[in-house]
Amino acid sequence: MMLEPSIDKLLDQVDSKYSLVVLEAKRAHELRDKERPTKEFKAVKNTLRALEEIADGTVKIHPSPELKRETLVEKRELERLQAKMKEQLIKEQIAKEEAEEEAKQKNSRAAKAAAAE
């Protein structure tokens, strides 16, 4: 059985077999943890999906691990802030709807009281 993509094509993208294995494993873990894929896959398994991405050149070894960590921290902070903003918007929408409902009930009671007089 031939490996697809071929080892030669994969080694064109990285410096060594060791680097290839490490990159594949890390990317497979990212895909497992629901990281966004960079392309549509033919394969079902995350390890083979990672190899497809490496062969296409859409996934690379980051030249500076420290810079990658900083980038990931910034990305997670941005995601956290976006989630917080979304939550705040939902809370504001709920408060607005509750205020509108309260105003309707108040108007309804006032209309009933006026009709009863």
UniProtKB/Swiss-Prot annotation:
Keywords, in A-Z order = DNA-directed RNA polymerase, Nucleotidyltransferase, Transcription, Transferase
Q: Where is this region: Disordered?
A: 96-117
Would you tell me the Gene Ontology cellular component terms? DNA-directed RNA polymerase complex
Q: Biased-composition ranges for Low complexity?
A: 108-117
Q: Output compositional bias ranges, type Basic and acidic residues.
A: 96-105
Q: Report if keyword Transcription is assigned.
A: yes
Which EC number(s) does the record attach to this protein?
Answer: 2.7.7.6
Q: Which GO terms describe its molecular function?
A: DNA binding; DNA-directed RNA polymerase activity
Listed InterPro entries: DNA-dir_RNA_pol_omega, Pol_omega/Rpo6/RPB6, RPB6/omega-like_sf
| GO biological process assignments | DNA-templated transcription
Which reaction(s) does the protein catalyse, per the Swiss-Prot or TrEMBL entry? RNA(n) + a ribonucleoside 5'-triphosphate = RNA(n+1) + diphosphate
Quaternary structure note: The RNAP catalytic core consists of 2 alpha, 1 beta, 1 beta' and 1 omega subunit. When a sigma factor is associated with the core the holoenzyme is formed, which can initiate transcription.
User: Family assignment?
Assistant: Belongs to the RNA polymerase subunit omega family.
Protein function: Promotes RNA polymerase assembly. Latches the N- and C-terminal regions of the beta' subunit thereby facilitating its interaction with the beta and alpha subunits.
Name used for this protein in its record: DNA-directed RNA polymerase subunit omega
Which organism is this entry from?
Answer: Lactococcus lactis subsp. lactis (strain IL1403)
What is the organism lineage in this UniProt record?
Bacteria, Bacillati, Bacillota, Bacilli, Lactobacillales
| Gene this chain is encoded by | rpoZ
